[in-house]
Amino acid sequence: MAVAAVGRPRALRCPLLLLLSLLLVAGPALGWNDPDRILLRDVKALTLYSDRYTTSRRLDPIPQLKCVGGTAGCEAYTPRVIQCQNKGWDGYDVQWECKTDLDIAYKFGKTVVSCEGYESSEDQYVLRGSCGLEYNLDYTELGLKKLKESGKHQGFSDYYHKLYSSDSCGFITIAVLFVLAFAVYKLFLSDGQGSPPPYSEHPPYSEHSQRFASAAGAPPPGFKSEFTGPQNTGYGASSGFGSAFGGQGYGSSGPGFWSGLGAGGLLGYLFGSNRAATPFSDSWYHPAYPPSHSGAWNSRAYSPLGGGAGSYCASSNADSRTRTASGYGGTRRR
């Protein structure tokens, strides 16, 4: 009897040792000691990037950040990095709070953290680095207000920004200066040969004509010959600028007074428009008036059309206003 009692514990030890040996062999094969196998409840925080993908074991990798819809749409704004913090266990799964800097026109809608289960979609353990965030991007009240305003004036706003963009300001300035220089040349410096002489009721060599011509004097060097020529305006004759403008008004086919007037008007419009803010910009920058004099000979001069500090072309280069936005959601295993 004593021998039988001693033999039973030895017989029980053999199955236990065999089971322990099997566990030691099968454990690593099942991934129990794999450092990539982690309990999701132990994860405190996730930092996710828009240009990176998750790790994968059973399935294909997915983007760490993925927009899946919302009232604003996925093309409206793309956050570069989002951090999600573990806020606790609700009895079913981990709950998350995700934060990032968003434009004030947008906010998070529905958010969910998606992780790859290590063995299956029901596994409490997940693959390390396999978590990503799926989110909706919605408009805030301010964003909806801006959307309605831009919808009413979309055509004019697009045209205004294209016309006064930083790329087009330099070209427009050069073109206007070229037209203005050409108009001045044709108006004052070019001695046209094809235009008929100005009409006068007196013969060109009469005493009346010669008297006024001598009173006007010779034209300045480089100016038109008819710059000071006689012209009948109803009060006798006129000279100087009156004659120059009057002479162009009688049948002259070349550019003259009207081309100069048009070029001046265009230049004035350009200068005036550049001082005005865009009609739908909330953060337009108005440069301060320049000082009355400069303290040094090489100090930067104020230029309303330049590209230096305090100068601008009408373009959307103002920094957009942002604030920290939060989204809340649970977990989905895949």
Swiss-Prot record:
Residues 190-334 are cytoplasmic. Residues 198-219, 310-334 are annotated as: Disordered. The chain crosses the membrane at residues 169-189. Pfam families: SARAF (PF06682). Keywords: Calcium, Calcium transport, Endoplasmic reticulum, Ion transport, Membrane, Signal, Transmembrane, Transmembrane helix, Transport. Residues 1-31 form the signal peptide. This is Store-operated calcium entry-associated regulatory factor. It comes from Mus musculus (Mouse).
